[in-house]
A protein has these predicted regions:
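Sec/Tat signal peptide C-region and signal peptidase I cleavage site
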Residues: 19-23
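Bacterial N-terminal signal peptides
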Residues: 9-17
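Expand to "…catalyze enediolate/carbanion chemistry for C-C bond making/breaking, isomerization
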Residues: 24-334
Length: 334
């Protein structure tokens, strides 16, 4: 019994020492150089991220979606009218090699009509948006960013803590300090391929691979899918996490919880009062937080959606998107 007790004490001491060492490593030395957060963008000319360019002009953006695909699919989609492409790996194959090849195809078949090297690419991942899942799977966020994408949409984003962990996983340890965020954890080497996809030096990539608009020089966008009642309960807090730029309300998954089936529409409107209430809550939360709201749009609803404040619409290559671009008098090439 005495040996077991001593062994238990030793294990507890070892665990405590290990956790203390990890905690100490997470705190930068007092003399470590920490750049100040710029108050406004210091770069001039076209942004890397086409979405940001459009938003800075007050324009809504439109996206298309692909579930996986490599080099050839990237080449084919380089000519899209869409401002960005959702590369769907929540339910599609989780294949980071293919993602890298897709980005290379976009780059080599570019530039876009607007003069950007590629359309922006936002990735979804099979990470449940809970605190424990984010702690265990932050590597997926870092792998996606290392492929040169322009942002992450966190699915089933249930808690502010999960949103915060996503942002911290995406930032480098030397990034400007931000109240409400711990030091970033993204590692050296992640800049090599990504900087080539962006057409910048590795050093410049590490400076601008930051969440926008938190960092005015940032070129990365991070969003939340509010898709279930647990996420609804925290939405007003989650959307205020530093570094979050947009959110959507996930009607398909919400329908499972509210109606026992995927959400249904009639001309874009919700057929269930409960679903309409969920959408309204998420929309109001984004407006209060000063971030963008994403919603499905079709030809019958796109104008009303834009009037309501929707700044991200589906159907990047569709007549609905063309109708929306004309309504907001977009001057950039379609």
């Amino acid at each position: 019994m005495m040996k077991k007790a001593l062994l238990l004490v030793a294990l507890v001491m070892l665990t405590t020492m290990t956790m203390t060492a990890i905690a100490q490593q997470a705190v930068p030395p007092e003399n470590a150089p920490v750049p100040a957060m710029p108050k406004e963008a210091t770069r001039t000319g076209k942004r890397v991220n086409r979405i940001i360019d459009m938003w800075l002009k007050g324009q809504p953006v439109y996206y298309s979606q692909i579930s996986g695909g490599g080099y050839e699919q990237g080449k084919q989609m380089a000519a899209t009218k869409a401002d960005y492409i959702t590369y769907e790996m929540e339910h599609g194959p989780l294949d980071f090699k293919e993602l890298r090849e897709f980005m290379r195809g976009l780059l080599e078949a570019g530039p876009t009509r607007t003069g950007h090297k590629t359309p922006a690419v936002i990735v979804t991942l099979p990470i449940p948006g809970t605190t424990d899942a984010l702690r265990a799977n932050a590597w997926m966020i870092q792998q996606a960013l290392a492929a040169g994408v322009h942002g992450i949409l966190l699915c089933n984003a249930e808690s502010p803590e999960a949103a915060r962990l996503m942002i911290e996983a995406a930032r480098y340890p030397f990034a400007p300090r931000v109240d409400g965020l711990a030091q970033g954890t993204r590692g050296n080497g992640s800049q090599a391929y990504a900087s080539r996809m962006w057409g910048v030096t590795a050093e410049e990539y590490m400076r601008i691979a930051e969440p926008w608009p938190l960092n005015p020089d940032g070129e990365l966008l991070f969003g939340l899918k509010i898709e279930n009642p647990r996420a609804d309960a925290n939405v007003e807090t989650s959307v205020r996490v530093p570094g979050i730029a947009f959110a959507e309300w996930g009607p398909g998954d919400h329908g499972f919880y509210v109606m026992g089936r995927p959400g249904t529409y009639k001309d874009g409107g919700e057929t269930s009062p409960q679903m309409a209430a969920v959408r309204r809550r998420v929309l109001n939360a984004t407006k209060a937080a000063g971030i963008k709201f994403l919603n499905a749009c079709n030809e019958n609803t796109v104008i009303d959606q834009l009037k309501e404040g929707v700044m991200i619409c589906t159907g990047g290559d569709s007549p609905a998107a063309d109708k929306g671009r004309a309504f907001t008098k977009r001057t950039d090439p379609w």
